[in-house]
Amino acid sequence: PEMMALVRSKGKKVISYNPGWKYDVGEIDMTHLWSYRGKAQPGIPAIDSKFHYLNHFDTFADLVSLYGSRIYNTPQGNDDIAGAILALWHDRLSPTESDMIRNNHLYPNMLAIAERAWLGGGYEYFDGLGTIMPPRGSKDFNAFADFEDRMIWHLSRYCDKNDFVYVKQSVQE
């Protein structure tokens, strides 16, 4: 309670990890769900970052997973689900920031989770197809292919080509 009061006295909001302490509504402002054990509590907005750590899977599979994932396995945000965090959590020492961005496909992955957070939707929560491309010709496959086209168009215009290394997956057999 003392730390929460101190944080609020500085004009800041209180965010706590979950799993962790079980708070009452109004005690904190938001929870950060960082593992599968983390559960949103009704009345307390939650930020989902479970499996949103880059380099958790294969760098190309991350994009498929993030694009197809429902944030907190909900089809749309609501008062209890505030959004998601994507973290660059690389396993290897990278000499430069640019190496971290490129090696973890930050920009493509960032756009995938941003689209999901902005539009809602998705078709699972990492536990069905996970890193596997949806079946060719399916609604989900076609949506991913459309996303790839738009992503490549934007990234080729606004990102340094050295930081945006991507091979279109929806054309691969």
Predicted regions and their residues:
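Substrate-binding cleft of carbohydrate-active enzyme catalytic domains
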Residues: 1-14
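Flexible, acidic glycine-rich loops studded with aromatic residues
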Residues: 14-29, 33-173
